[in-house]
Amino acid sequence: MSMTLQGSLLDLTETMELRSVAEGLTRTPLAHGAWVDLRPAWLAGAGRLFDALVDVVPWRAERRQMYDSVVDVPRLTRYYAADETLPHPTLRTAREALSDHYQAELGERFATAGLCLYRDGRDSVAWHGDRFGRSRDADTMVAILSVGSPRALHLRPRDGGRTALRLPLGHGDLV
């Protein structure tokens, strides 16, 4: 990739290491039996993973229909189907660790992966309901490993309402 990006000034760890999913994990209950888990600093050395992914992932710029016009998606993306090899061994190890941790509770393993590259403060994601990778009728399993600059993840109920949850995601955090 031809642009210069910086993941973090704070994560100077030389080696990448996934820590225990359960240790330091906090669960926040949501409506209708849903919940969100936050595990700060799950990946040590997230900056090294960020640098590697920026260089090796074949990022895609997409356009989407939004109401009456077609607009640029304000981030770069790459989706990996269940039969595709993930672009870095740490991502494969992370997917296995997440599957091992959550399979008994959720009834299935993580199979696909979607990567997003937010290039600057203008890149973003709008309110949406994750449906990619959904293998069951009612629920969607989504795990997010943040390896770039810190940013907030905002969640709100699908059926509307004013209650929203703001999760500050730091370098190496898992949600």
Report the location of each language-model feature.
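Non-heme Fe(II) oxygenase metal-center motifs and adjacent flexible, charged/small-residue loops
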Residues: 1-175
